[in-house]
């Protein structure tokens, strides 16, 4: 596929709608804005706040990664790029309405449902994705109240699993500079098991994640089997060496938490026993050896998929013209990020994905497959409800959160949508009427684009 083309003087620019303000959506907007600096680009987000995975999926103590949002702040400062939050596509407006209003529509809403393990079920079995959203004070998880107990078992050995291990094992005083609500770690387990089907050398986590665990100075770690380092693959060598370094004997007079890694074991069942539960594991290779773990709770970290109530079904928009290899769903309709390729790869992969999909969009406009003629947000404004949030509204929310730095936190997130909306609209009790707010939307967009 060709490289991104340079903008031609006099070229008519398309109006563009992007669904989802996470990394996939923002990188898509960033790339298309570079191609067409004056094109109207509108990013729609279900929540009143932007940045999706960066805000609610990245671990609260990984603020360096979350700082990527600052480059997206600069994107939204551009006159032709707009954020419209608190709009759920599929509920408040349809994809078809977006297609009627915009020349190009890109679906980049991600996939957030935890992949279930059919063999494990019960009221003490939690998905790691939901747990991470809870740690990040996601408004969808306000009623979520996990009871991890004194002993918890994490199924999975990818980076998300290691994030959960670290957040549960770190001392509560070690979260200075994070945006983790202190109330969420008032009760931490003293025993953590980590179970993975593959051997240590094939585990999905990065060695850096293990080195972070080694920084917890009042924890002890053990592992049942680790391949000796020396593998010709440098990543595998680094991974096994990090594990051996982690589990090497070290003086911890009074360990606060004990973490055990079990590689090469597959969970088979979870049965209630007395006050707790017994997790039955079978050896992945032999299928003969059995291991039993007494646990109070289980957290599954085995990947993601579709299934959350608000998610858009990609299959519904596939057509005979679809070419998912480069993000095409139908004429003028595209998809990017996890929504396109499935739940694989992190933020850097989403950046590459966005560039690839944008190349196809640019080629379609250049070839005449898409003829720019639609007015974008101006056509759609009458369909929007009065509680949408623009980027200025998000900046108000951001300022309030950043001002709340109790307990050494870098911010304290507003936990519910109603409170977010109050601060976004700078209101207390009065509500703007539908017609007045729709006029505000079109006036604001017009003023911004004339700057």
Curated annotation (Swiss-Prot):
Top EC class of this enzyme: oxidoreductase
Residues holding NADP(+): 157-160, 197-198, 345
Record-listed FAD binding positions: 24, 45, 53, 89, 338, 345-347
Classification via InterPro entries: FAD/NAD-bd_sf, FAD/NAD-binding_dom, Ferredox_Rdtase, Ferredox_Rdtase_adrenod
GO molecular function, one term: oxidoreductase activity, acting on iron-sulfur proteins as donors, NAD or NADP as acceptor
Entry keyword set: Electron transport, FAD, Flavoprotein, NADP, Oxidoreductase, Transport
EC number(s) reported in the record: 1.18.1.-
Cofactors required: FAD
A Pfam family it matches: Pyr_redox_2
Matches recorded under SUPFAM superfamilies: Nucleotide-binding domain
Family: Belongs to the ferredoxin--NADP reductase type 1 family.
Role: Involved in the degradation of cineol (eucalyptol). Catalyzes the reduction of cindoxin (CinC).
Protein's UniProt name: Cindoxin reductase
Organism the protein comes from: Citrobacter braakii
Name of the encoding gene: cinB
């Amino acid at each position: 596929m060709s490289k991104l083309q340079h903008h031609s003087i006099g070229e008519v620019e398309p109006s563009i709608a992007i669904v989802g303000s996470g990394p996939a959506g923002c990188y898509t907007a960033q790339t298309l804005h570079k191609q067409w600096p004056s094109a109207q680009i509108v990013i729609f987000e279900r929540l009143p706040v932007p940045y999706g995975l960066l805000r609610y999926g990245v671990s609260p103590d990984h603020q360096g990664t979350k700082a990527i949002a600052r480059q997206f702040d600069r994107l939204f400062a551009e006159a032709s790029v707009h954020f419209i939050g608190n709009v759920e596509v599929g509920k408040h407006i349809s994809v078809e309405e977006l297609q009627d209003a915009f020349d190009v529509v890109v679906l980049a809403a991600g996939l957030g449902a935890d992949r279930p393990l059919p063999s494990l079920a019960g009221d003490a079995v939690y998905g790691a994705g939901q747990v991470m959203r809870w740690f990040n004070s996601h408004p969808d998880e306000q009623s979520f109240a996990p009871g991890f107990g004194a002993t918890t078992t994490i199924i999975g050995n990818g980076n998300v699993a290691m994030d959960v291990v670290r957040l549960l094992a770190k001392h509560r005083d070690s979260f200075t500079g994070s945006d983790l609500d202190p109330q969420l770690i008032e009760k931490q387990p003293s025993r953590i098991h980590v179970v993975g089907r593959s051997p240590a050398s094939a585990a999905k986590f990065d060695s850096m994640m293990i080195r972070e665990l080694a920084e917890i100075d009042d924890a002890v770690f053990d592992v049942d089997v680790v391949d000796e380092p020396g593998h010709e693959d440098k990543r595998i060598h680094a991974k096994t060496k990090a594990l051996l370094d982690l589990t090497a004997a070290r003086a911890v007079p009074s360990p606060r938490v004990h973490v055990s890694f079990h590689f090469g074991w597959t969970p088979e069942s979870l049965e209630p026993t007395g006050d707790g539960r017994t997790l039955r594991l079978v050896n992945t290779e032999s299928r003969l050896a059995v291991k039993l773990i007494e646990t109070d709770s289980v957290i599954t970290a085995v990947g993601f998929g579709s299934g959350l109530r608000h998610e858009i079904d990609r299959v519904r928009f596939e057509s005979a013209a679809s070419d998912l290899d480069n993000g095409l769903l139908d004429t003028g309709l595209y998809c990017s990020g996890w929504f396109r390729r499935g739940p694989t790869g992190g933020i850097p992969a989403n950046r590459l994905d966005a560039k690839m999909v944008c190349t196809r969009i640019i080629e379609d406009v250049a070839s005449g497959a898409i003829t720019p003629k639609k007015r974008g947000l101006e056509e759609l404004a009458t369909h929007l409800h009065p509680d949408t949030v623009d980027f200025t509204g998000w900046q108000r929310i951001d300022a309030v959160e950043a001002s709340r730095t109790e307990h050494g936190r870098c911010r304290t997130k507003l936990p519910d949508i109603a409170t977010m909306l109050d601060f976004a609209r700078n209101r207390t009790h009065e509500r703007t009427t539908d017609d007045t707010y729709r006029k505000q939307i079109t006036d604001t967009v017009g003023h911004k684009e004339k700057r």
